Amino acid sequence: MLINLLPDFFAVLNSTDRIAAYLRYFDNHRSLLEAYWVNYVVEPESPHFSEVVKSAALAGRNDLRTMLERMDVVTLARNAEDQCRNLLEIDSDIDVVLMVGVGAANAGELVVNGRAVAFVCLEHFTSVANPETRGLGLDPELIPLWLSHEISHGVRYTSPGSRSEMKTHIQEANGFYSYWETGKRTTLRELLINEGIAVQVSRMISPGHASWEYYGYDRREYARIREMGPVVARSLIGNFDKTGLGLRLKYLSDGMSEDARRIGDYVLPDRCGYYIGARMVEQAMATRGAAWTVRASAAEIAAVSGEAAATA
């Protein structure tokens, strides 16, 4: 189901007291926005919450308004949702959310009370980098790419037919996904495959973009990760079945220190696991299809192609 929070956010911008209006907006959509803040920003109880709210509420939004005047983002989102429904044979409830965030993730996944959420934060998709909003300046044509990426996570986490480790951990947490808690309990193999599937699905739903855009890299980062692929693959040997938040952060996040990403004489590129994960699932996607692969266990996927070949 498509949920469009843009009208409510623009009501905040049109208010005479934007900060108070944002807090009302937060309360009106608390189950969704609290999960977004906890997973991608800061805890709402944190002393930094009010600072971030103030910055987001008072920021200029001319770039966003200009983009929305020329792009029908609702139709983009609906089309991506429909394509994913057909490709992935979706059989669980997934909310697709258009929203304006606070300059954190450009897109993301949540599970709230057992219901999956795939969201995009439109401040990042205006084609113009905006330091005031921390907007990345991505092309709005990339919205279907990122929505399909996140929708695939939603299927893997909540489909009745999913055999994924992520689904098991979310069920054990009473139907809630946490980047931090779920991440630290999940094996590195599952984390890599989870992101690799999302990359491959986004290629199928939104073809024609530069190769690096499917990973969230820039051209230079993509070249470096391809060059260092063998180093990254060797670093994974013996770690596939390990768990720990540090592994997720090392291979699948931005902003870790060089020391945290150091392997011998090398420093792993940020988010290098997306590239490796996409290679790990290529054979399964090609031979068994997207609908099977998105629900398959990591062991089933590894058995199709063989881990050694996928990460060589």
Feature roles, as predicted:
Residues N62-L122:
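Auxiliary, metal-adjacent structural segments of Zn-dependent hydrolase domains
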Residues E141-G161, E195, V199:
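Active-site recognition of the HExxH zinc-binding catalytic motif
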Residues Y157-N194:
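Post-HEXXH active-site segment of zinc metalloproteases
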Residues L192-S206:
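An active-site-proximal "capping" alpha-helix that borders the catalytic cofactor pocket
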Residues E213-A312:
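Pan-zinc metallopeptidase signature
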